[in-house]
UniProtKB/Swiss-Prot annotation:
An example Gene Ontology biological process: regulation of transcription by RNA polymerase II
Family designation: Belongs to the TADA1 family.
Localization in the cell: Nucleus
Protein name, UniProt field: Transcriptional adapter 1
UniProt main location, coarse: nucleus
The keyword Ligase appears for this protein: no
Signal peptide limits: none
Compositional bias segments (type: Basic residues): 95-104
Taxonomic superkingdom: Eukaryota
Function as written in the Swiss-Prot or TrEMBL entry: Probably involved in transcriptional regulation.
Amino acid sequence: MAAHASELEIAKKNLTDAIGENVKHYWANLKLWFKQKISKEEFDLEARRLLAQDNVHVHNDFLLAILTRCQIIVSTSEGPGSLQWSGGSASKPGKPSRGKKKFPSVRQKFDHRFQPQNPLAGVPVFSPREAEEEELKLSAQTLLLPSRGQLEARMMVSAFESDLDSVAEDAVSCMLCALQVHLKDILTALVSRRKAYRLRDGHFLYAFGSDVTPRPYLKNSLPAYHSATECPPASASLPAAAPARVCPDEAEQNAALLLACSADTAAPPLQPVSVYDLLEALQVQRRVMPSHSMYALNMERILARLWHPSHEELEQDHIHRQHLALRDGLVT
C-alpha cells in the first residue's frame, strides 16, 4: 500500500513539474471529469493543451497511479484475507527428510493420440467499443452509496486542489462513517414528521409508527405513556449503568395499559414518501443540515424536482407518442 502511495506522489510531482503554473486548470478539468460534466476525450484534449508533446506520458502515468491505488484499496478492504501456501516442504522441522526410492513410471504415453489445441480459442472476444459505451454512473443515478474507491478518488481530487499530496485511509473511513450518519439523520427527520414515535431520556427517538398516542382527557393516559417512555435517572452516588430489563409479564402489562389508555381511532394510512415530505422535514428541522451552502443547494434541487408538466405539455407529449407509434408501425 505504501509503495502505491509513493508512486502516486511521484506521479503527481512529475505532473505538477511538467504543467507548471497551469496545474490549477488541470485539477479543475479533473474535477469536471469526475463529475461527468466532460468526457474522457475532452479531458485528454485539455491535458494535451497544458502539456508539451514530450510530457504527455506524465498525464497517463498519473491517471494510472490513481486508478491503481483505488483498486488496491477496494480489494484490500472488501476481500477477506485468505491463507496463502508458503510453498515449503511439509516435513517436520528438525528431522532430516529421508530419501524415497523413485520407481519408474508405468504410465503409458498417449501423446500421439491427442492433437494440440489453442487454449485461447474459447475466450470471448473483447470489444473496446462496448467498454467505451458503458458510461460511469454517479451515485445520484445508481441511487447507491459511493464505494470506497470512488470516495477516495473524489477526496484525492479535492486534496490536489488544496495543494495536498495524498489522502489517508483513516480519512476515507471517517468520511464513509460521516456519510452514513448524515443519511440516517435525514431519514430520521423525515420519518418523525410522518409517524408517531417515543422518546427515551428526552432525546433518543425510537418506536416509530407505534400509533399509540395518549388521550389528553384521560387521567391515567399521561402517567402510563411517560412510564413507558422515560427511564429513571441515575443516582448521584451510584454510577450510571444500563437500565434493567423488564420481565415479559411486566412488559405485556405495561403495553396493555398503554393501549387501553390510548385513543380508539386508528390513524389513516399514509401515502408513500414524496419530495414534499423531504422539503417539509428540511424546513422544520434545520439542524439536520447545518451548512448553509449545502442546505441552499439541496433546497434548490428539491424545488426543481417539484416541477410538473402542464396540460398543454401533456397533450403535446401524447401526440408525439402517437406519431412515434405510427411511424414504428409503418416501418415494421
